[in-house]
Amino acid sequence: MLVLFTDTDCDVSPKLAEELGYKLISMPYEIQGKSTRPFVDFEEFDPHPFYEQLRKGVLPNTYALNPYTYREYFEPIFKNGDDILYVHFSSAMSGTFNAMNIALDELKEEYPERKFYEIDTRGITLLSLNIVYEVSKLYKEGKSVEEILNWAEQEVDHFTVYFFAEDLNFFKHSGRVSGLAAFFGTLIGIRPIMFMDSDGKMKTCGKEHGRRNACRHLVNVMKEIGDNVQDYHIIIGHTDFQEGVDALVEILKQEFGKDVKYEVIDINPTIGSHCGPNAMGLCFHSTKR
């Protein structure tokens, strides 16, 4: 039997994981000296109190899981005689996968007949979630692991996310932009437009002055490179930024019709630790990243 895994950095909750047929790995963060594992140390994520702390100047950190924790997740599956397919966030964004590989090397010696497969979504949060949705669909249709992996090889780069943040200081803290760029960008209202490239790394592709122009930029990109977007999930993810969501949805309906279907999610606190409050992204099926 094949057992599906994903993680909270793909913005999957325990409830959604159960609906889609996944076991869920919790990716931790630390805030004010307290280590927290989403949906292990709390049942539901309440975004507003978390992001209010960040607005008041609290700077959280994230850290990698250790090999022992990965063993705790994977060994019971192997011991039961099952194989694993893990759909995860970008391996280029974290050292946690080094720890995972250490654990897997040990487990392969102990359970040599068992198989471990992985799909690197080369994304985070809503981009990864979109791929999690599609893999679940294929699995429930009875596709073999080889068919699912072949699909991923062809399709992962056909899901893309474009996003921006109103406060660049959190990207500065995580090393994504320089201190000077963060200071002046936030001061004069410049919103760099960013995306996840085919290597799973965050890149800047432009900049806009003001919230509404940034929202329009995201929708314009979807018009330009979107591919059968309404046959797949259109996902808007945000960090306690309802005003931005409202502006984006208004423009989305202007360009794609008032009946356009979309999903809005709260970005998880581990990823939110890096982008801060008032960040937002748009994910869709595309011709390219």
Annotate each language-model stretch with its function.
Residues 44-51, 74, 78-79, 106:
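A short glycine/small-residue-enriched secondary-structure motif
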Residues 3-63, 69:
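N-terminal glycine-rich anion-binding loop in soluble enzyme alpha/beta folds
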Residues 1-2, 81:
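Local beta-strand N-terminus motif with an aromatic residue
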Residues 3, 9-23, 28-30, 92-96, ...:
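Mixed-charge interfacial surface used for oligomerization/domain docking
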Residues 51-67, 198-213:
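Acidic/glycine-enriched edge-of-secondary-structure segments
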Residues 55-93, 98-102, 149:
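Glycine-rich phosphate- or other oxyanion-binding loops that anchor nucleotides, phosphorylated ligands
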